[in-house]
Structures are given as C-alpha cells and as structure tokens.
C-alpha cells in the first residue's frame, strides 16, 4: 500500500487532527520501510516506495516517538494510530493484510500470480472481494488497480501484455460528484480511464446504476454495452454517453430480454442489438435469480439449512 492507502485504513480522525495524524504516520512509516534490507541497498526511498516492512517495527517506532514527547505535547495522535493498528492485527478478518506472517518480499511473485505471467493458457484472474470487510473494500480495490497502473508505467521499456481491468459494481468505486468522497480508488480508476491507453491498460466498468457513475469516467468509455434499463434517469445518462448514431437504439433498451444488449462505439463497426450465447450451467456464475414460486412451494430440510448457513456465517467461509 502507498501512503494514501495507509491513511484510509489506519487513520480514524478528521479535520485538523487527521492532518496531524497523517504527518506522524508518514514519518513512522518511512522509518519502518527504511529498516528493510531492500531500502538499504536502494538508497533514497519515499513513504510511497513499495518496500515491505514489519508491523512490529511500525508499532515500535510509534512507541519510541511517543516516548520522546514532552509532557505538554499531546500523545493522542500516537495513541489513535496504535489503537487502530492493534485493532486490525487482532481482527481475523484483516489477517490477509496484517498477518504477522506476511513479512517477506513477495511482490514479484504476487504480480506474476495476479497478472498471469506466464498465463499457461489461463489469462484471466478473478479477484473476489465480497469477503473483504466493507470498510477497506475500496482500499483493496485501489491497491490492486494501482498495481496494474504502476506495473504498466514502470514496464514501458519491456514488452508487457496489454491488460483489461474489469470492475464490477463500479458505481461504488467511481461515484458521481454528489456521492464522491475523494477516495484513493476513485482517483486511480479515474486516472486509468483517462491515461491507461498510453500504457496498454483498458478499463471495463460494470454497473446497474450508470447514473451514479462519475461523468468524466463514463465519457472515456470507447465502447458501451447497454443491457435492459427501466429507470429514465439511467437511460438518459447512457444516451448522453452514446455516439450520435446509436441514440436511436435507446428506445429499445427497456424492452431488451435476458442476455440481450445494445453495443456501440469503437468495439463494433456499427451500433447493433446482440444476443449473448447461452452458457452451459456449470460455467455460469452463481448469480441467477431464484425461482420464487418453485422455492416457496418446497418444504423440508429447513432446520438443517439454517444450521449450515449459521455455521458458514460464523466462520466467515
């Protein structure tokens, strides 16, 4: 994570207090990164340098800095950061990010795995963040998106493969101005939408609420695939983003059937109405709508069902 992403996860204050906390975190984080042998061989590093560090080092440095304070100086900022750090380390939901076992330099291996280099006939990576705690989901998506962008920038002199980054529920991460919160994920996805082509990165945004997307990002989409939309506001938003010659298709959007869509833009020679092929059942994602009538008419096995669901719920798996 870079410094901005650390702030989103570790800082709980706001206003002037947040700036004070951020300054303290920047100083301590840089000191923790500097303890790594990689930092010592590279020379000068910054707080954003992708150098691994030990959480225990960060904790100890915070403790040391707090011990240097005069009595008149408030230790509240240090206590806030340490308390949040201890809370994250103790919560099993955050073990994938803050486990004490994650102390090695695994960056190259991680990138090879995520980017499928080599692909070995399987060039697609699917990253499911549904099990990630909701308060850091955006940060996790920001880290992954920034890895894609930074890898492309620093790999310009290499023959790296173009990457298509597809983001589901995109309105959560690049919301319109009314709902924008200045998060790091919105900044990096907006930057990829505007600059990614120069570095061989394309961005695919999937949303059921296009009117909630940032207009600046949607305007960068060269190809639009529109499925059935019933909301007038969403239809108007999609119409504004469509090329002039495709707007006549908009009247048919509310009447589209399942698996039908309107495609227009750079990806097709002319705007067209398309029906997707039916996938075999074992290849479909678990997103099909349940049959209410069929399930309501079935009885039996409810007690065991509840037990199984509660067990998975409690174990978070």
Where are these regions (language model features)?
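Alpha-helix boundary/capping detector
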Residues: 32-36, 170, 222, 247, ...
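Conserved P-loop NTPase motor module
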Residues: 258-317
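Preference for short coil/turn "hinge" residues that link or interrupt alpha-helices
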Residues: 51, 81, 104-107, 125, ...
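Conserved ATP-driven motor cores of ASCE-family P-loop NTPases powering translocation/secretion/packaging/pilus
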Residues: 12, 184-185, 190-277
